[in-house]
Every structure is written in structure tokens, then in C-alpha cells.
């Protein structure tokens, strides 16, 4: 049992805030060494309180810098890097330090049946503000599914797996988003992104084991997980709003989305959302008002879709 486990929600939020603050300071003060670590390793529903406790128990005085390096590992090499590190027989630059982190925190490449398993992905999502700065600082980071796959080229920064931590839902049941908000747009995008990532990366044997044989099965599964993440109370509402603002800043003017971004959203709607079969589209229409608007107007041209989306966000 983790001896440093936060006792309540306030303590959990404070612990995340404190460690994030220290980790961000380390990232700012040690950009050169973090960049070196990045270069060395690079190629050309869990209980947050328990995980925080385990990290604090194992990390001690080096926890903040370790969090930064684990997050760098996650976004430079992916969650499977843990398995790569443990298989290495020949030491390379950065590998010994990465291996030490794997050993110290008992990092694993996938959760399996261990609810308290520590993966690079979980660390990154537990400290979204640190993850945001890491992904902002380094260029050329790869995604399994990027913005071009969503017909929204140039918006990769919206798709990182920590972004759902910033999303606030309007309802605890579908439709989850009904207001004309930034969170509504992020939720809509991540419903599709999570579906496509799982469809591409989950091994076929695991899909079969979980009964994820059709697109409708996969998207119901991934949307359920997304909703759980969005409902997380790891961050208070002020932190969530601040995170949304930071993530969306390149695409906004005076807290309103640029028309050029709404054009990309229309492209996403017409070329991706509307491309799915009837079952999937019907499911999507039930998840939020924006998806319903897109699905209900599947026959429209992309320009007509753009006009509808602009109107949708100007109604309130």
C-alpha cells in the first residue's frame, strides 16, 4: 500500500499541482539535460490517488525530474518503450537512465489486470500540464493517428492523450456535450481519435477477446473510456479550463475559434464522421449536439457543413 497516498480529493489535487509545479520548474531549469535525454532515446480508469502515492513512495527527492523524463519517454518512444528498455542487452546513450526509471517505478508497457500498474501513458495523463509543456517543447513527436487522419491537418496538439483530462462534460449521460463550448469540440474530436487509435493499435487477438469485432463495438468501448477520463476529478474546474485554453490557443482569437479552424472541423465532419456506416453515425449523433448536427447533415457539401458549424457556435 502506498504510504504517501493522498487522503482525499483536495489532497490529490494539491499533490498533482505540487508535483507538476516542481516538474515544470525542473523542465524550465534543465532544458539542456532534458533535451539531451530526449535526443538519446529518440528515433530520426485507474485510481489516481493510489498511483500518486506509489510514485511519491518510489520517487522521493527525484520524483519531479523523473516525472519529466518518464513523460519524455512516453511521447518520444511511446508506451511500449518500457518493453524495449528491458530487452536491451547493449547499453546506448540514455538507455541506462531509462532502464533505471523502469526499475525504480516498476513501469510496465501495458496495464493488463493490474489496476495500479504504472505505465508511461498513465504518468503522462496524471500530469497533463507537464505533458503539455513536453509536447510543446519538442518537435517531430509521432502519433499513431495524427490530425491528417482526421482530415484536420496541422492540429496535432489537440490530439495528445492528456487533452481529455481538460474536458468538462455537460452531462453524466449522453448527450455528454450540448453547450457551444471548447470542451464540446475537444470531446467530439477525441471520440473519433480514440476510436481510430484503438482500431489501429489494439492487437486483433485482444479485440476478439473483448468482443470488439465491429466498428460499432470499438467506438462504444473507446467512448466509454473517454467519458470516464473526462469525468475524472484529478484537476479542479479552474485547472481544466486553463488547460483547455492553453491547448486551443493557436486556433482561437479572443477565446473564439478562428474561421480557418472551423473549416477544418467541417472537413473532419464531412470526410471522417460522415464516412462511417449507419450504426456508427447514429451512435455518434447520440453522444453530443455537434455530432448530431454533422450526422443530420451528412448529405451537405463541405462548404455547407462549414456554414452549419459556424452557425452552431454562434447560436449562443
UniProtKB/Swiss-Prot annotation:
<dbReference type="InterPro" id="IPR008864">
    <property type="entry name" value="Nucleocapsid_Tenuivirus"/>
</dbReference>
<feature type="binding site">
    <location>
        <position position="43"/>
    </location>
    <ligand>
        <name>RNA</name>
    </ligand>
</feature>
<keyword id="KW-0543">Viral nucleoprotein</keyword>
<keyword id="KW-0946">Virion</keyword>
<feature type="binding site">
    <location>
        <position position="46"/>
    </location>
    <ligand>
        <name>RNA</name>
    </ligand>
</feature>
<comment type="similarity">
    <text>Belongs to the tenuiviruses nucleocapsid protein family.</text>
</comment>
<dbReference type="InterPro" id="IPR009522">
    <property type="entry name" value="Capsid_Phlebovir/Tenuivir"/>
</dbReference>
<feature type="binding site">
    <location>
        <position position="240"/>
    </location>
    <ligand>
        <name>RNA</name>
    </ligand>
</feature>
<dbReference type="Pfam" id="PF05733">
    <property type="entry name" value="Tenui_N"/>
</dbReference>
<dbReference type="GO" id="GO:0019013">
    <property type="term" value="C:viral nucleocapsid"/>
</dbReference>
<protein>
    <recommendedName>
        <fullName>Nucleoprotein</fullName>
    </recommendedName>
</protein>
<keyword id="KW-1139">Helical capsid protein</keyword>
<keyword id="KW-1035">Host cytoplasm</keyword>
<feature type="binding site">
    <location>
        <position position="122"/>
    </location>
    <ligand>
        <name>RNA</name>
    </ligand>
</feature>
<keyword id="KW-0167">Capsid protein</keyword>
<dbReference type="GO" id="GO:0003723">
    <property type="term" value="F:RNA binding"/>
</dbReference>
<dbReference type="GO" id="GO:0019029">
    <property type="term" value="C:helical viral capsid"/>
</dbReference>
<keyword id="KW-0694">RNA-binding</keyword>
<comment type="function">
    <text>Encapsidates the genome, protecting it from nucleases. The encapsidated genomic RNA is termed the nucleocapsid (NC), and serves as template for viral transcription and replication.</text>
</comment>
<dbReference type="GO" id="GO:0030430">
    <property type="term" value="C:host cell cytoplasm"/>
</dbReference>
<feature type="binding site">
    <location>
        <position position="76"/>
    </location>
    <ligand>
        <name>RNA</name>
    </ligand>
</feature>
